[in-house]
Amino acid sequence: MDLMVPEYAYMFGFLQADGHLKQGPGQKGQLRVEISARDAEILRAFQKLTPYYSSVTGRTRPTNFAETHTSAIWTLCSLEARTTLNELGLPYGRKSKTIAPPDVEFSRRGYLRGLIDADGSVGFTSKGFPFVSLTTASTAIASCLCDYGKDATGAERSLKRNTRDGIYNVLYMMEVAQCLVADLYYPGCLSLERKHSAAASLAAWVRHAGSKPKPPRIKWTNDMDRLLLTAPTIANAAAELGYSSSACQVRRWKLLHDVVPLPD
């Protein structure tokens, strides 16, 4: 399972998000992935990638969201296969906070696409704006996407857990989302068909005439803060820094009211 091969990197990312390794007595155990039956083709693709016997089955049962839900289940019992996955970073049992990108060299693009297919979203908001997001409890996973997103699009994201459930929701919107999904979901890549279709639809979005992108977030430094505090007027500071007077006014207010720390 060479993770520099995009298909294996994708599969591993998907398994980290939606797979479950279970250990039994002795050397017994299994890898199990259960997803909606509409996405069963991805499990058959995993089956073809895996040189060990495995099965794809289905079941229908009631859930909290529907009276009947049909799912597809991929089951792999090989000890050698489970050992390989475990050593690469797929732990036994509960894993949401402990998973992390592999320590070996791997295809980041394939790996992140697998995570987004399993635990992310690609599409349009209720207002028709394109977006791509990933929900994860793992700091390492969230950091990996933020780093890749910066490399691919130039957009920076700060890591912050939701106060309600302690989960990270890394979100990209508008042109940045278009750029990122175009990079991740290239023609012929292994992916969920519905996510690939959604990614393709984002490419057709065009910003309304007269609507301008938000300016990039300002990264304030100690030198910039000192200039803000010592400049004779906000207008002087704005002209010196090259930012709007309103942005400089807000930052100065935060400095004077201890909302952010004063420069060293």
Language-model segment annotations:
Residues 1-264:
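Internal intein/HINT superfamily modules and their associated LAGLIDADG
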